[in-house]
Amino acid sequence: EKLEREGTTADSYEKLGAPIGEGTYGTVWRATCPRTGRQVAMKKVVLRSEREGFPVTAVREVRALRRLSHPNIVELLDVCAAAPASGSSSPGDAYLIFEYAPSDLTGLLAYRKQKLKPPEIKCLIKQLANALDYCHLKNIMHRDLKPSNVLITAKGELKLCDFGLSRLFSGPGNYSTRVITLWYRPPELLLGARHYDHRVDVWSAGCIFGELLAGHPLFPESSEVRVFQKICERCGATSQETWPQELKSLPQWDKFAPRGADGENPGTDIYRDLLLKHGEVAVDLLRGTLQLDPELRIDTQGVLQHRFFAQEPLACQPSEIKINDPRLSCHELDVKRHREKLREDREALRQQQSQKRSAAPGAAQAGGQPGADEGASPKRPRVG
């Protein structure tokens, strides 16, 4: 049995501060085990009734992590339950207890004062490729790879987490298309493919790699159609002639098919932009991970053996990655809270200025009314 029984019940763990994450089936807190003093992450699994039972996403996560043991994959330490509320007929909530990491990749990128340097990017991508390679060797697809599911420890070690959408595979099978967060979803899933394999994870890893190189998400759109259009534009695939026949036969092709002419300049080609900043070798690896045809897409072994990692400057050591203060929580939820606070502060300042203009002499004669120039609140930027 892999699990360490650090506590007998969830009540033996002491939660510290506000939640640090919100998952598919519960909320995540930083906590300590009073018996060992170890900091851990507690993910609550809400059990609404005995009939519903343990959520399938939680079952998948436990099953996957019991099969996996790797330095770059988060460790599941315990599964325990909290006592039900007094007088309640509902079962108590269950908790998954994980090793704690003070940051995820979203938080690292948001709070750093400078972009990642090439040796840091190489170090992170190599660790990510190692984690994925091990998963695929164990016949597990992650199917939800994104920056917020990539944890960073205080020592700069990368830990792949959140296996709630993972599943076993033994080659292309009849799987769900409603997996992988939209910005990191490969074109075959956007087009409705149900027979796919581990290379869907490689596309997502390529999106993360490109995000580290560019300093921003590659395909940030709000719908499947718009993400597909963004892929067409940014990958130089605005003509139907550039798409493989296998993808043209998928259910959503007629709805999503690009309308550009063959040879048309997309104008926002990511490879052209990144070639100037990072060179041909980095762009070659990115192209390999973002191949539109999954049959031609590089696999994790191909990533690890790519000349990108042998080219100077070499990858730094994890401990050399400049991370945020490990005493602080720097996760996606913290980034969202920070952006929401900034939005509220801007809105309060705008209303204050509007009221001052309205109260100024001559405002009434000019037709000004308190709040007359108020518009809709700015939309909060979405984090991958």
Can you name each region flagged by the protein language model?
Residues 16-24, 28:
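Protein kinase glycine-rich loop
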Residues 27-47:
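Glycine-rich ATP phosphate-binding loop
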Residues 69-80:
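Conserved HxN/HPN-centered segment at the entrance to the catalytic loop
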Residues 91-104:
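Conserved short submotifs of the Hanks-type protein kinase catalytic core
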Residues 124-125:
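Activation segment signature within eukaryotic-like protein kinase domains
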Residues 238-287:
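C-terminal lobe substrate-recognition/regulatory segment of protein kinase catalytic domains
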